């Protein structure tokens, strides 16, 4: 079995693959203070609930946008599984030309998503990933990663509103009953939700115009399912896009 680990600023997503089949997946909170032993104990409990043992895992691949946790999880891999993991970063074989001024600046998660998206659709793509930041990535019809845009994530936007405006409460991110809201909570939800739908559609529209192609638009990330139904541009939600990209990259880098 292959263990894939996607480390984000807010959540860590883990998946177990048996060949090309995703057997189980878990989402846990990112905690920069946790040690490799603490993560090891947590993963053991997750595995126990799925009737999986450490010895069942034969390889590990990690994508991380949190540098302080990269070393922690590499130690976890060696100490608990007996393997040095494959880490997504400079030098890894992606099979995708990266047309970025400095390829080392591109977040690992963005490349992983691009690889998975192009492998599935084999056409030009806009990939919208609703994470701590919301990223928009463009892959052209030749399968080249061309770059994209980065916007504050939904949760960051809502938290900023709560923290910087004294009289505004912290609220859940949900679709409100109306745009013309009749109370403060719904008003905040309307502004964030519909404002974000507009942000997504406008950036996607401009990417399409600039590219002079007709890309397929897909979304992933924890809040993709909330925004996509209201978006005029998102055509599909790929819940496991990043995990699938990690599996593909592992296969491309096997010795």
Swiss-Prot record:
Disulfide bonds: none
Binding annotation for substrate: 100, 107-110, 184
Catalysed reaction, written as an equation: (R)-pantothenate + ATP = (R)-4'-phosphopantothenate + ADP + H(+)
Pfam family, one: Pan_kinase
Binding site for K(+): 129
Catalytic residues (UniProt): 109
Residues involved in ATP binding: 6-13, 132
Cellular compartment(s): Cytoplasm
Chief location category: cytoplasm
Co-factor requirement: NH4(+); K(+)
GO biological process entries: coenzyme A biosynthetic process
Cofactor note: A monovalent cation. Ammonium or potassium.
Assigned keywords, A-Z: ATP-binding, Coenzyme A biosynthesis, Cytoplasm, Kinase, Metal-binding, Nucleotide-binding, Potassium, Transferase
Pathway linked to the protein: Cofactor biosynthesis; coenzyme A biosynthesis; CoA from (R)-pantothenate: step 1/5
One Gene Ontology term, aspect cellular component: cytoplasm
EC number: 2.7.1.33
Single GO MF annotation: pantothenate kinase activity
Role of this protein: Catalyzes the phosphorylation of pantothenate (Pan), the first step in CoA biosynthesis.
Family label: Belongs to the type III pantothenate kinase family.
Record PANTHER family: TYPE III PANTOTHENATE KINASE
Quaternary structure annotation from Swiss-Prot or TrEMBL: Homodimer.
Protein's name according to its UniProt entry: Type III pantothenate kinase
Organism annotation: Geobacter metallireducens (strain ATCC 53774 / DSM 7210 / GS-15)
Organism taxonomic ancestry: Bacteria, Pseudomonadati, Thermodesulfobacteriota, Desulfuromonadia, Geobacterales
Gene name linked to the record: coaX
